[in-house]
């Protein structure tokens, strides 16, 4: 009787992933991927999350890896199944999230000969993956078992090496595909990890930073801009640096510097609104900017930095690459944020720096927020109030996942700094509106804590399939559906002036009744008519297992003018108080 080599070959493959610290596999049903799926399910150190739809599965894995900050296996059968991972792989590439894609494939003799469910899977994801290989067909020799273990270690290491990102291993398999679980699939040839891949913090010596340190020591008018941050230590060190330099921090919501129990005295949270005013920009123009992480959501900040090349920009990016869409940076420094902050602070003199510059920013920010609160609309159709109310209701130590298009921009505008500890997530790599529901589900599974998802109606429609995870896994997900019946962001863009074709090409109303989606996936549903009703609907459900859908119906046309009028009035009041 011929021994099927799949059991020990794929068993060694999966076991080495577990030895590399991987604890989760997202698996899509399929025949050719049987040994990968079954041996993941049988491994005592790997949790399997079954997702039926491959596109949703890809984004679920993305959210899971984003929450855990370590690689997740993503497994599917051969054919178009793998192609459905493409959007999630692209997002993982640009947001630097480690995913290990394992695509089962037909053996070489069945490729390019018209065999069913066989497509060319070589380099399927192009340059969006950091590493690709087509593994050898299963053999049970000691040499081949060492080979497949080494390949697993390498794939895990490549995914975690900075900048982190997706990798792809194509796995050709011959029938029979069912492994023999009674034959010690993980024990044979387990003599320890054959390749131990370690990554560390990227550092830079003080001498290399001498010119930057000297510039910062002399520049009193500076500011710190923070994009998405992952490390609490980095946050604390950036705050310490801002206090030492007396620089304001323009904190993107994804920096998570606006929320939490840390010191927020130097954090500025209303900049996206008041930096739209040219006079305020002139009064608050810095000589130097230190930017940590990717470019923030705020378009006014981006345009300000892009259009004024005389501002000295210092970009700190530990992961390498070139994240500077302004094309105006003077210094690109590839080192850890905490290392940079500590080195700069160590070189500062003990002399007390003037706080006048920082106080200007604090004054404008404080007056703007105060005035905006006095003119807020009680109309439930005004979306801005949602975020000001929600930030005080999100359960502590839970997560807030924010959809792209208008939701993340409204969070940037209306989300104030406050002490409630929770984490904000969003898919800002490629900024797509697809896969957002599934990404939020993955974060929920990864954190083992409730998630509140704020999402627009078109984005919600894109990923309705993702809601199945809430029902199957009992995930505590509250979806706040901001339904303006179409693409609300286009009403703020020049396309809105094209009246003849605007609704058909850009507004794209669907007219869908989303309460049926809640029923389909066994969730609760409410559609509050006031903000008091919203609070009553949200608070009791936010940390309970299952799907809870709260629909906020808004009006695209009226919100544009109301939004602009409110912000313009607040800016006018600030300028009056500042005697501009």
Swiss-Prot record:
Its EC number is 2.2.1.9. The keyword Nucleotide-binding does not apply. Keywords: Magnesium, Manganese, Menaquinone biosynthesis, Metal-binding, Thiamine pyrophosphate, Transferase. Pfam families: TPP_enzyme_C (PF02775), TPP_enzyme_M_2 (PF16582), TPP_enzyme_N (PF02776). It catalyses: isochorismate + 2-oxoglutarate + H(+) = 5-enolpyruvoyl-6-hydroxy-2-succinyl-cyclohex-3-ene-1-carboxylate + CO2. It is an enzyme of class 2 (transferase). Its cofactor is Mg(2+); Mn(2+); thiamine diphosphate. It comes from the Bacteria. SUPFAM superfamilies: DHS-like NAD/FAD-binding domain, Thiamin diphosphate-binding fold (THDP-binding). Catalyzes the thiamine diphosphate-dependent decarboxylation of 2-oxoglutarate and the subsequent addition of the resulting succinic semialdehyde-thiamine pyrophosphate anion to isochorismate to yield 2-succinyl-5-enolpyruvyl-6-hydroxy-3-cyclohexene-1-carboxylate (SEPHCHC). NCBIfam families: menD. PANTHER family: 2-SUCCINYL-5-ENOLPYRUVYL-6-HYDROXY-3-CYCLOHEXENE-1-CARBOXYLATE SYNTHASE (PTHR42916), PROTEIN PHYLLO, CHLOROPLASTIC (PTHR42916:SF1). Belongs to the TPP enzyme family. MenD subfamily. Homodimer. This is 2-succinyl-5-enolpyruvyl-6-hydroxy-3-cyclohexene-1-carboxylate synthase.
